[in-house]
């Protein structure tokens, strides 16, 4: 909830580090004072997520926004089912042994 993040950031300032837990809200959260992201997308495209955050911290917001938009199709694919099923599948397809999903 971006409104809640804005309120917390305004109240706490630098006393609290805020991280995005939603890949589709990285740049908006960073713009509100966020420090980074806990990302599902970074499991299959770490450079893309890193470059998006780095561009923002380098004050290249146009590039950060472009990279945020570049992540959207991947986000949609990785959230077509509940996490971690799609991301583990994608990692296995990429040749990274993420193992099988286990039953709860």
What are these regions (language model features)?
Residues 1-79:
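Catalytic alpha/beta core domains of metabolic enzymes, predominantly
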Residues 30-34, 72-104:
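Conserved short secondary-structure transition element at the edge of the structured enzyme core
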């Amino acid at each position: 909830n971006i409104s809640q993040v804005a309120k917390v950031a305004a109240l706490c300032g630098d006393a609290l580090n805020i991280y995005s837990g939603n890949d589709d809200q990285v740049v908006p959260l960073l713009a509100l004072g966020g420090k980074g992201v806990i990302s599902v997308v970074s499991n299959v495209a770490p450079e893309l997520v890193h470059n998006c955050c780095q561009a923002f911290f380098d004050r290249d917001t146009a590039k950060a926004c472009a990279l945020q938009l570049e992540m959207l199709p991947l986000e949609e694919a990785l959230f077509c089912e509940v996490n971690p099923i799609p991301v583990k599948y994608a990692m296995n397809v990429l040749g990274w042994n993420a193992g099988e999903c286990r039953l709860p």
